[in-house]
Swiss-Prot record:
NCBIfam families noted in UniProt: dxs (TIGR00204), PRK05444.2-2 (NF003933)
Subunit structure as annotated in this protein's UniProt entry: Homodimer.
Function, as annotated: Catalyzes the acyloin condensation reaction between C atoms 2 and 3 of pyruvate and glyceraldehyde 3-phosphate to yield 1-deoxy-D-xylulose-5-phosphate (DXP).
UniProt protein name: 1-deoxy-D-xylulose-5-phosphate synthase
The protein's Enzyme Commission number: 2.2.1.7
Organism of derivation: Thermotoga sp. (strain RQ2)
High-level lineage: Bacteria, Thermotogati, Thermotogota, Thermotogae, Thermotogales
Gene: dxs
Length: 608
């Protein structure tokens, strides 16, 4: 595999290989979609790292995992790389199911240092001599989990090597004090000049690196006089850098030097997000996650959120918008441009975002916390303890609910409805269309008096923003009977309703816009008219909407049969939404077969 070949290559050959990999990643990602800019920035870093450390022996952990395409190419997946993010193909993230060289599955930011500590202690207890290396971005480093683990390194005598991949970005540009501190380390002209002079003096001596080792005290004193103790050194860690993250020869020397150090060290590497692809270099946020080529520009629910909130906020000065390093992804950059003083990007800090929103709401504001469903999981305690327990008026705009698609199991939004249903005071709304989404936002914000979650998918559609805003109105958030039939009643929530409406059977169809509280008036009406009720949801079936309906029907003393359709007890793989709904039996064809089976079975029992 390439992993062995790179150890025999000259630096000129490595540079050519880096360009070949850059070209390959660009071509495949522009075709399949994926994380382009992040991966173009870590090619040389990965080549240098794998010349010194070996993932067959050393635990190398890629935080978030979205920047590990070169790792995949080097570790035996070069021939399959064209399948990345396609159904049945390679994952866009690091996963143990794919290769034993993927030491720890990742997809969410900030987990790598804690995982590295766990592996390090396992190796120690088992008597195994292995290195632990973590590659983490400056954006992920701002997450609470990363900082918590960083704080433990000195305490448990870790020897972990942390490669800080600093490109000044997470998805959007980084924010906060730590980002400012890293920027100062990158750009301090006095320190950089002093370091350069010291390096030249050392290079002129006959014994080079040995003298540099002996003169550590002088170097550290120089750093201390110029810029004081940096953040990492204050935690008892050794800090090296910053270094050019695209200089393979330099990085290899640095990695060799720290490999056998008997203490934790941080190597600060500065890379350029989107390196080598002009469009991505100029707009790394846009190319952080590229969409497959050939798709026409369409509106998304995220776009509508930004435009809708901006419009409502012109009249309602109490509306504020909060996100966790996802201003563009959530559509809130639209709101930010018009209302910058009421927009807050708090970095990768979902827990902080929720509690920050709770306090805003408790003092008269109308906070909208917009976070992807998969990331909101990280703030479950804050949702319960800080928001719901105090009945704080906070609107959770839960983006990417349901089957997300090519990003796979780490990013599907299949748990939010389940984990929110059990929270007292929480209202849950699941619109079935863009029109319903816009009007639900308007209605909730007009009467916000406690926690409300509006969940919506990663879907695009044709339409003009003006059309949706002009038709925005206050609506009844209850259930609606859209179609009446004789053989069964189907209650669907969310955009999966559109698949249900395609079922060519004589059934009643109900749009359950509000998941919690249940619309018991409509439910009782349906229960009186039907002996077979089927619920459909694009979420985990266990403990979900269907279970909630079944419980209520049982409490009502209903004697019919209820069937819950949703995602079974599995982690859903990656693929297009169409492919995944088909696999799950939740597309119109699969639903028709399942519903017909139950209708026939009920008919044989003489119940329909």
């Amino acid at each position: 595999m390439l992993l062995d070949e790179i150890k025999r290559m000259s630096y000129d050959e490595l540079k050519r290989l880096a360009e070949d990999i850059r070209k390959k990643i660009t071509e495949v990602v522009l075709k399949n979609g994926g994380h382009l800019a992040s991966n173009l920035g870590t090619i040389e870093l990965t080549l240098a790292l794998y010349r010194v450390f070996d993932p067959r022996e050393d635990a190398i952990i890629w935080d978030t995992g979205h920047q590990a395409y070169t790792h995949k190419i080097l570790t035996g997946r070069d021939e399959l790389f064209h399948t990345i993010r396609t159904f049945g193909g390679l994952s866009g993230f690091v996963t143990r199911r794919e290769s034993p060289l993927d030491w720890f599955g990742t997809g969410h930011a900030g987990t790598s240092i804690a995982a590295g500590l766990g592996f390090e202690k396992a190796f120690e207890l088992l008597g195994e001599k292995r290195h632990v290396v973590v590659v983490i971005g400056d954006g992920a480093l701002t997450s609470g989990m990363a900082l918590e683990a960083l704080n433990q390194l000195k305490n448990i005598n870790s020897k972990m090597k942390i490669i800080l991949n600093d490109n000044g970005m997470s998805i959007s540009p980084n924010v906060g004090g730590l980002a400012y501190h890293l920027s100062k380390l990158r750009t301090s002209p006095i320190y950089l000049k002093g370091k350069k002079v010291l390096k030249k003096v050392l290079e002129k001596t006959e014994i080079g690196f040995e003298v540099e080792e002996e003169m550590k005290y002088l170097r550290d004193s120089l750093k201390g006089m110029i810029q004081g103790t940096n953040f990492f050194e204050s935690l008892g860690l050794k800090y090296f850098g910053p270094f050019d993250g695209h200089n393979i020869e330099l990085l290899e020397k640095v990695f060799k030097r720290i490999r056998d150090y008997d203490y934790s060290s941080v190597v600060h590497v500065v890379t350029k997000k989107g390196k080598g692809f002009t469009a991505a270099e100029k707009d790394p946020t846009k190319y952080h996650s590229a969409s497959p080529s050939g798709k026409p520009k369409m509106l998304s629910y995220s776009d509508l959120l930004g435009h809708t909130l901006s419009g409502i906020a012109r009249e309602d000065k109490k509306i504020v918008a909060i996100t966790a390093a996802m201003a563009d992804g959530t559509g809130l950059s639209i709101f930010q441009r018009e209302h910058p003083d009421r927009f807050f990007d708090l970095g990768i800090t979902e827990q902080t975002c929720v509690t920050f929103g709770a306090a805003l709401g408790l003092h008269g504001m109308k906070p909208v916390v917009a976070i992807y469903s998969t990331f909101l999981q990280r703030a479950y305690d804050q949702i319960i303890h800080d928001v719901a327990l105090q009945n704080a008026p906070v609107l959770f705009a839960i983006d990417r609910s349901g089957v997300v698609g090519e990003d796979g199991p780490t990013h599907h939004g299949l748990f939010d409805m389940n984990y929110l249903l059990s929270v007292p005071n929480m209202k849950i709304i699941s619109p079935s269309s863009p029109e319903e989404f816009v009007s639900s936002l308007y209605t909730v914000l007009k009467h916000l008096d406690g926690p409300v979650a509006i969940r919506y998918p990663k879907e695009s559609f044709y339409g003009e923003v003006e059309f949706f805003l002009e038709n925005m109105k206050e609506i009844d958030l209850g259930w609606k009977i859209l179609k009446r039939g004789r053989e069964a009643a189907i209650i669907a929530t969310g955009t999966i309703l559109n698949e249900v409406l395609k079922i060519p059977l004589d059934v009643t169809v109900v749009n359950a816009l509000t998941v919690k509280p249940l619309d018991t008036t409509v439910l009782k009406e349906i229960a009186r008219e039907h002996d077979l009720i089927i619920t459909v949801e694009e979420a985990m079936k266990i403990g979900g909407f269907g279970s909630f309906v079944a419980q209520r029907l049982q409490e009502m003393g209903w004697q019919g049969k209820i069937v819950n359709l949703g995602v079974e007890d599995i982690f859903v793989p990656h693929g297009s939404r169409k492919e995944l709904l088909s696999m799950l039996g939740l597309d119109s064809e699969g639903l028709t077969k399942t519903v017909l089976t139950y209708i026939k079975a009920r008919s044989r029992e003489g119940k329909v």
